[in-house]
């Protein structure tokens, strides 16, 4: 138990182009070694490519993609009577968002396109249409939770 009161979460500022906190969080997820300008260039370039390909507003396509990626359930390990059980549990809203963004960037990096902008744009478009590796990861997590539904009564 912590002796002091719990620490308040820091609020991120919305980005300048889309006035969205979600875009800022995505930039922070993409960022490596504190290179925020590079991360911004990657994301805004990816959004331009999304607009070229889909002829739709990129922020709307991005929101659709994130909704398709964010997990509703996950499994957590819990030790009961000397055995470990995979217990399905609901995912908190903040964790849903951070997992979705993390998976989007992670699976975009694994794609075969030339630049990171192209990789991210393709992954966003695929996720918005319900395909893509990030959506497969979510479905895999949901399948694991469904398979271990019998242990749900161990939830804490």
UniProtKB/Swiss-Prot annotation:
<comment type="function">
    <text>One of the primary rRNA binding proteins, it binds directly to 16S rRNA where it nucleates assembly of the head domain of the 30S subunit. Is located at the subunit interface close to the decoding center, probably blocks exit of the E-site tRNA.</text>
</comment>
<protein>
    <recommendedName>
        <fullName>Small ribosomal subunit protein uS7</fullName>
    </recommendedName>
</protein>
<dbReference type="GO" id="GO:0015935">
    <property type="term" value="C:small ribosomal subunit"/>
</dbReference>
<dbReference type="GO" id="GO:0003735">
    <property type="term" value="F:structural constituent of ribosome"/>
</dbReference>
<dbReference type="InterPro" id="IPR005717">
    <property type="entry name" value="Ribosomal_uS7_bac/org-type"/>
</dbReference>
<dbReference type="InterPro" id="IPR023798">
    <property type="entry name" value="Ribosomal_uS7_dom"/>
</dbReference>
<dbReference type="GO" id="GO:0006412">
    <property type="term" value="P:translation"/>
</dbReference>
<dbReference type="InterPro" id="IPR036823">
    <property type="entry name" value="Ribosomal_uS7_dom_sf"/>
</dbReference>
<keyword id="KW-0694">RNA-binding</keyword>
<keyword id="KW-0689">Ribosomal protein</keyword>
<comment type="subunit">
    <text>Part of the 30S ribosomal subunit. Contacts proteins S9 and S11.</text>
</comment>
<keyword id="KW-0687">Ribonucleoprotein</keyword>
<dbReference type="InterPro" id="IPR000235">
    <property type="entry name" value="Ribosomal_uS7"/>
</dbReference>
<dbReference type="GO" id="GO:0019843">
    <property type="term" value="F:rRNA binding"/>
</dbReference>
<dbReference type="GO" id="GO:0000049">
    <property type="term" value="F:tRNA binding"/>
</dbReference>
<comment type="similarity">
    <text>Belongs to the universal ribosomal protein uS7 family.</text>
</comment>
<keyword id="KW-0820">tRNA-binding</keyword>
<dbReference type="Pfam" id="PF00177">
    <property type="entry name" value="Ribosomal_S7"/>
</dbReference>
<dbReference type="InterPro" id="IPR020606">
    <property type="entry name" value="Ribosomal_uS7_CS"/>
</dbReference>
<keyword id="KW-0699">rRNA-binding</keyword>
